[in-house]
Each structure stands twice: as C-alpha cells, then as structure tokens.
C-alpha cells in the first residue's frame, strides 16, 4: 500500500501565495505518510489563458526551483501545474518534482476549444515514475474525456493516472459529472484515477475523487472549501489484473483489444 494526496485549492494570479499553498499541503501530506501529492491544473500561475503572456513561466523559473526545494525538504513527490512559456509558444504543463531533486514535465496534448487559441499542444503521452517506482500518467482536465488516452497510459504500464482539473462552476456539478465516466476509466483499464480541481467561491467548483481498478470510489470530497484528500493505493490489486495466470488477468481489458479493427 502507498498513500497519495490530491488537493482542492484556490489559486489566483499570485505566484508567491500559490507557492505558500504548495508548501502547506506538501508538508501536511508528508506528515500523513503520502508518497506523492497532486495539485490542480495551473495551480502555480492560476488558470487564465487570456493572461498567459503575462503570467506564464519558463521551466527554469525560480518558482519551479522552489517547488523542487519543497519536495526535497518534505521528502515527498509533488505534481503541480502551470502555464508555461517556451520560446515563442505557450503550454499547459504539469510537472513532477521528485524528492530526490529530479523533475519531469507533461504538456497537455488535447486542448479545449478556447485553449487552442492561446496554447500549443504537447506531442507525447508520458509514463512517469515516482521515487518509489510507482508508474503514473497524467490527463489534464478535458483530456479525461478521451478514453484512448487512459487506455494508452494503462497499456504502457500506468498504475495511477492523475487528472488535475481547472473546471469552472458554470460547467456543472463536478460530483455528478465525474460519476458518469471517471469510474469507467478506472474499471475498463484497471487503474486508479485521481482527480482534483481548482476551487474558489466565484469561479471554480472544486472536487476531489479517487476511483480504484474495480471502478469503485476509493475516496472523495466535494466540500465547498480548500482541503487535502488522502487515499491508499493498493498496488497488489493493480498487479493482480496484470499478472498472467492470475484469474483476474482475463479482465485486464486493454490486453484483449484487436487494434487492427480500429484503423
């Protein structure tokens, strides 16, 4: 068993304040025995595509060096999101900052209709390894609506797929909407899905949800406030679906596909 944490937080256009929030919850998660903590989409810079030119940061920004320091000092891996400036383009990026000081980044590959007018899409679906060896994938917000992404990550070995969101309240009740499809992503691919959303009293609706490889809710909270949600991940349960000869392996559905029929 390992413990993961997901955060519902308020992140505005205040980098310093957002770093303090990162420090606060990373420390709490570490004290509660978590191996990794995941923050919502664009939690460092705030999610403001219309202000990407002003608020986006580069991969060598001091703020990201500070996140790396927080990970090291608290001995916990940290997943944080930000608007990234790279040369003449902008990306929606989520970084994995390991407690040993190493980093990896995932750039959102499937952009929303409005995001396309500002950001450039990433070019790769990545499998990343936590310090403890757990293999993870990342799907950012609207990307969770593409089953092919989750399936690809599962086939490449992902055990947990983190799904940081920046969804506004106007989009509807997050608990009801996620219940329609997030459990199916877990069940069909025999993985854990760990979702979290930005929150405030005006714009973002929040929500945290973790579903297990059986499609059951492992942990959830939709309180109208900032919070940290901790959940245990049963790696033996995941392995039981992927070990040949195990009675559950016949139900690792991605391995039974016939992709030649889909082309």
List each language-model region with its residue ranges.
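Extreme N-terminal starter segment of soluble prokaryotic enzymes
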Residues: 1-5
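Short polar catalytic/cofactor-binding loops
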Residues: 8-13
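Cys-nucleophile CN-hydrolase/nitrilase-fold catalytic domain and related Cys-dependent amidase chemistry
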Residues: 15, 24-103, 168-189
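Short, acidic/polar
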Residues: 17-26, 146-151
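CN hydrolase (nitrilase-like) catalytic-core segments centered on the catalytic cysteine
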Residues: 61-79, 145-226
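Active-site catalytic loop in hydrolytic enzyme cores
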Residues: 85-160, 169-180, 243-248
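Residue-level detector of high-confidence beta-strand sites
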Residues: 105-108, 163, 220, 230
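C-terminal beta-strand edge segments of enzyme domains
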Residues: 127, 198-263
